[in-house]
Amino acid sequence: MNLHEYQAKSLFAEYGLPVSEGFACDTAQEAVEAAGRIGGNLWVVKCQVHAGGRGKAGGVKVTGDKEEIRAFAEYWLGKNLVTYQTDEKGQPVAKILVESCTDIANELYLGAVVDRATRRVVFMASTEGGVEIEKVAEETPELIHKAIIDPLTGPQPFQARDLGFKLGLNPTQMKQFTKIFMGLATMFVDHDFALLEINPLVITTEGNLHCLDGKIGIDGNALFRQPKIKAMHDPSQDDAREAHAAMFELNYVALDGNVGCMVNGAGLAMGTMDIVNLHGGKPANFLDVGGGATKERVAEAFKIILSDSNVKAVLVNIFGGIVRCDMIAEGIIGAVKEVGVKVPVVVRLEGTNAELGREVLAKSGLDIIAANSLTDAAELVVKAAEGK
């Protein structure tokens, strides 16, 4: 689960981090009034969506004219913002953040993730703020400095000072950076973050550190113990198909290919996508129906997959472990009849009663192609998607 920038900054403020005074607004009139409450003669207005690249897409504006704030809000509220991180439809804009403008002398980067290699929370800092950290990591990895947080001792001030020296901070900024670092590290654990970024963390013209942006990703598995954070969820930012799939305990992620995939087990699903790609196809989705591939869940899975107009063929790859393959085959047949599938369906069954399952499919009279192996299934579904 992701948070909006205004929500992230609200948490930053609770932990004593320096953020701009700002208000999240639902209407153009609220945005104009917010500028008046903030005061000054220069403001920043930002579309609130769960995606980066807002500035290049026109979703951020610096202005000293309240009527321009009104026009910006009237234009964007209710529309979708398309950036390089969204699909072609973009993300809906329901709120506009109005903030005081900050005079910037320099831009830094500060972020943290859960690193699986070290099994620790790892902080990353760089002098290359304001740009994509992935690009920095690829082109100039030596400019990224790290601090690994020991879960036994927690964050330590010396780690902040070490990063601060590498960023070239002066003594006053070092104290500010240490406070920011300690606050973020505590916040990360308190609220079960999976990702945290301040990009950029700026040095103002007065020489002070300031959190100019905020990006937070929450570990979805921990939401049961984070009621306050869970209440911040904005369902409008979720993919409609992914949200619908979650209601039926289906793990679905939309992609941009034309081969629909329905698999039981996340590992097998990723392997299936890889082999489809290997044989020249492009997966249209990741979909894990889980261990209980019942007729009802398979039917919903088909509906979700086929709601994507790009899907030209569907590959069903099921390993029958807990559930027998003949029962799964009957569920697939029932689902195909119920949904009225109009595209080719390739089914690969393996495991308990796999041969019996293939016989059930063959006798169904439906246009279902039974594959003998995963390679065979991938080749068949790619050809079917190409109309061959």
From Swiss-Prot:
Which GO cellular component term is one of those annotated?
Answer: cytosol
Q: GO annotations under biological process?
A: succinyl-CoA metabolic process; tricarboxylic acid cycle
**EC number(s) from the headed UniProt entry:** 6.2.1.5
Q: How is the cofactor bound?
A: Binds 1 Mg(2+) ion per subunit.
Q: InterPro entries in the record, alphabetically? A: ATP-grasp, ATP-grasp_succ-CoA_synth-type, ATP_grasp_subdomain_1, Succ-CoA_synthase_bsu_CS, SUCC_ACL_C, Succ_CoA_ligase-like_bsu, Succinyl-CoA_synth-like
Q: Give residues annotated as binding Mg(2+).
A: 199, 213
Q: Give the required cofactors.
A: Mg(2+)
Q: In which pathway does it act?
A: Carbohydrate metabolism; tricarboxylic acid cycle; succinate from succinyl-CoA (ligase route): step 1/1
Binding annotation for substrate: 264, 321-323
Keyword entries, A-Z:
ATP-binding, Ligase, Magnesium, Metal-binding, Nucleotide-binding, Tricarboxylic acid cycle
Catalytic activity from the UniProt record: succinate + ATP + CoA = succinyl-CoA + ADP + phosphate; GTP + succinate + CoA = succinyl-CoA + GDP + phosphate
Q: Which domain of life is it from?
A: Bacteria
| S-S pairs | none
- Entry's Gene Ontology molecular function annotations: ATP binding; magnesium ion binding; succinate-CoA ligase (ADP-forming) activity; succinate-CoA ligase (GDP-forming) activity
In terms of SUPFAM superfamilies, this protein maps to: Glutathione synthetase ATP-binding domain-like, Succinyl-CoA synthetase domains
Per UniProt, residues of the ATP-grasp domain are: 9-244
The UniProt record lists the keyword Ligase: yes
Per its UniProt record, what HAMAP family does this chain match? Answer: Succ_CoA_beta
List the PANTHER family: SUCCINATE--COA LIGASE [GDP-FORMING] SUBUNIT BETA, MITOCHONDRIAL (PTHR11815:SF10), SUCCINYL-COA SYNTHETASE BETA CHAIN (PTHR11815)
Report the function annotation for this chain: Succinyl-CoA synthetase functions in the citric acid cycle (TCA), coupling the hydrolysis of succinyl-CoA to the synthesis of either ATP or GTP and thus represents the only step of substrate-level phosphorylation in the TCA. The beta subunit provides nucleotide specificity of the enzyme and binds the substrate succinate, while the binding sites for coenzyme A and phosphate are found in the alpha subunit.
Q: How does it assemble?
A: Heterotetramer of two alpha and two beta subunits.
Task: Spell out the protein name for this chain.
Answer: Succinate--CoA ligase [ADP-forming] subunit beta
Q: What species does this protein belong to?
A: Shewanella oneidensis (strain ATCC 700550 / JCM 31522 / CIP 106686 / LMG 19005 / NCIMB 14063 / MR-1)
The gene for this chain is: sucC
